[in-house]
């Protein structure tokens, strides 16, 4: 009986450890390609905020863009990306997109990517946007 108890205990322990391993993988760092795409989107969002004069846009788009920048950074820090590494990637993306014309298509693709990648991303952006001003 004692041997059966040990065997069940170790089986249960292995299942728990395996489950924790799988769960930690799900919450782990963004993949390299997703991180690059996130940075690119942050660059697009920042370019939206600093649109050159003469560009047509909705004010709400600027709010959503800035809220999205904040949500991406919060998420990056949550999954273990160092703040300095995140900021370096953001700076490169901002340099790439700064001064570019507004692209509704690119902005909407970034919103879709954020919502698909970040748990509760849409709600998080909405919540942050409500606190901006």
Predicted features along the sequence, with ranges:
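Classical Sec-dependent N-terminal signal peptides that target proteins to the secretory pathway
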Residues: 2-29
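Generic detector of short alpha-helix boundary/capping microenvironments
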Residues: 16, 29-30, 50, 98
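Hydrophobic alpha-helical segments
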Residues: 16, 35-39, 107
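Short N-proximal segments of mature Sec-exported proteins
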Residues: 30-81
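Compact alpha-helical subdomains of small soluble proteins
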Residues: 59-133
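Generic cytosolic/nucleocytoplasmic N-terminal low-complexity/intrinsically disordered segments
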Residues: 1, 5-7, 34, 63
């Amino acid at each position: 009986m004692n041997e059966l108890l040990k065997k069940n205990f170790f089986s249960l322990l292995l299942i728990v450890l395996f489950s924790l391993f799988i769960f930690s993988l799900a919450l782990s760092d963004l993949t390299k390609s997703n991180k690059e795409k996130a940075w690119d989107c942050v660059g697009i969002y920042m370019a939206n905020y600093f649109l050159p004069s003469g560009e047509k846009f909705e004010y709400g788009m600027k709010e959503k863009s800035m809220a999205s920048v904040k949500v991406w950074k919060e998420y990056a820090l949550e999954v273990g990306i160092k703040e300095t590494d995140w900021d370096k990637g953001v700076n490169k993306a901002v340099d790439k997109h700064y001064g570019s014309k507004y692209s509704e298509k690119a902005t909407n693709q970034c919103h879709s990517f954020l919502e698909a990648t970040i748990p509760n991303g849409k709600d998080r952006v909405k919540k942050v946007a409500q606190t901006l001003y």
